Design a protein with these regions (language model features):
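An extended, acidic
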Residues: 122-240
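N-terminal subdomain of lithium-sensitive/metallo-dependent phosphomonoesterases centered on the IMPase/IPPase/PAP
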Residues: 1-67, 234-240
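A short, compositionally biased
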Residues: 6, 80, 108-112, 188-189, ...
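Short loop/edge segments at beta-strand edges and connector loops
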Residues: 46-48, 118, 198
Length: 240
């Protein structure tokens, strides 16, 4: 029922700053029913039903965010998507992002090329940090970086790196793996570097579902990005 510019009526906060709508719950129910039929052996971990950890630690698990970027969804903006990943042995092996408001479908599969609307993705290979593109509403001029449009969905921001629309996406928030699992496999298969904010391997389908931020960037900027983020975290700490 989403429409550009129309605000969603049935929304509430499940925790401070964490918005949920009727649509989140409806999509969650629909996806769980369909995906469990598709791979009956797989466990289930999603944003809306993460209290159920019956699947945590299973070899195969669906890791799902029914609407990533809910704030944009409920505000009638386009920067949201449905994020579905299949995780095997703690790594995402298949991921899909469906962004209906942008008419884009992103698909990634381990060992295969990633695509958007069927077109092969080639991630940014930028080498120079100064002047690199960062999804942001605004950036201080002294940073010498270029702000590009920022969807509320972290998954779509990572997808921008996968399609050479942005060069670095970083978050130092304690986030959740359902936000990034699908985008991780898409960006990695497109040639981007993807780790947690401190440059450590992201491990999926742990029982807590949490991850210390994410870094998704040109492989040629990765070392410098890790240094910059590490310095920031040591000075400011990680945010929640």
């Amino acid at each position: 029922h989403w429409a550009l510019g129309r605000k969603e009526a049935n929304i509430w906060e499940k925790s401070p700053g964490q918005v949920v709508s009727d649509a989140d719950l409806a999509v969650d129910r629909f996806l769980r029913g369909e995906l469990e039929k598709l791979v009956p052996a797989a466990g289930w971990l999603s944003e809306e039903t993460h209290i159920d950890h019956s699947g945590a630690g299973d070899e195969l698990t669906w890791v799902v965010d029914p609407i990533d970027g809910t704030k944009d969804y409920v505000a009638g903006k386009t920067g949201w998507c449905v994020s579905v990943a299949l995780v095997q042995n703690e790594a995402p092996v298949f991921g899909v992002l469906v962004a209906p408001a942008m008419n884009e479908t992103w698909v990634g599969r381990a060992g295969r090329s990633a695509t958007v609307n069927g077109r092969a993705l080639v991630a940014t290979q930028r080498r120079q940090y100064e002047g690199c593109r960062i999804p942001a509403e605004s950036l201080p001029p002294d940073m010498k970086l270029v702000a590009v449009p920022k969807p509320n969905s972290i998954a779509l921001r990572m997808a921008m790196v996968a399609d050479d629309r942005a060069d670095v996406v970083a978050s130092t928030r304690w986030g959740h793996e359902w936000d990034i699992a699908a985008a991780h496999v898409i960006a990695a298969q497109a040639g981007a570097s993807v780790t947690n904010a401190l440059g450590e391997t992201l491990v999926y389908n742990g029982t807590h579902g949490k991850a210390l931020g994410v870094l998704c960037c040109s492989p040629n900027l990765y070392d410098e990005a890790v240094q910059r983020i590490g310095k920031y975290v040591s000075e400011n700490g990680a945010s929640h």
